[in-house]
Amino acid sequence: MVIMGRVAGPYAVAGWIKVFPYTEYVDGLLDYPDWWLGSEGGKWHKFKVIEGEVHGSVLLASLEQCADRDAAARLKGLKIAIPRRLLPALPESGEEGYYWSDLIGLAVINLQGEVLGKVAGLLETGANDVLQVQNPEETERLIPFIDQVIIKVDLAAGRITVDWGLDY
């Protein structure tokens, strides 16, 4: 499963949910008629998407098994995933060799070996993508996802090496 977003909570009273997508484009999840909701390391449950729409930087969606606000509220915090076999194939290496969701949770370490935190999300700014890096002190760093800064993405080791100082 590739985690593609997170349920932020209910939206309105008719059972709709608000979704924070982890996809390159806000509407990327709407390409899939079924979503799997659950938690990493836990069980995944298939939900049929009835309707969805972009609402600023989030998605609003109506799911077949979610008839009212109470049902939608019970989904808050769950991850949304798609089986990897249903996703487009990626090149073996390079910037396009992984999905954004593959980067979530990776440790971010600078060239001096200092741990900056873990990837909490990514932002699309138009000029370039930006890593949202959260550290244990609950502070957030925004690190540009550009060649001059991102030295290496090592999915197997679970880390991203960056040319970025602690004081930036």
Curated annotation (Swiss-Prot):
Q: Which SUPFAM superfamilies match?
A: PRC-barrel domain (SSF50346), Translation proteins (SSF50447)
- Residues in PRC barrel domain copies: 95-168
- Cellular component per GO? cytoplasm; ribosome
Give the superkingdom in one word: Bacteria
The reply on keyword Chaperone is yes
Localization (cell): Cytoplasm
Q: Which UniProt keywords apply?
A: Chaperone, Cytoplasm, Ribosome biogenesis, rRNA processing
Q: Keyword Chaperone on this protein?
A: yes
One biological process term from GO is:
ribosomal small subunit biogenesis
**GO molecular function, one example?**
ribosome binding
UniProt record similarity statement: Belongs to the RimM family.
Q: What is known of its domains?
A: The PRC barrel domain binds ribosomal protein uS19.
Subunit composition and interactions = Binds ribosomal protein uS19.
The record's annotation in PANTHER family points to: RIBOSOME MATURATION FACTOR RIMM (PTHR33692:SF1)
* Function statement: An accessory protein needed during the final step in the assembly of 30S ribosomal subunit, possibly for assembly of the head region. Essential for efficient processing of 16S rRNA. May be needed both before and after RbfA during the maturation of 16S rRNA. It has affinity for free ribosomal 30S subunits but not for 70S ribosomes.
Q: What is this protein called?
A: Ribosome maturation factor RimM
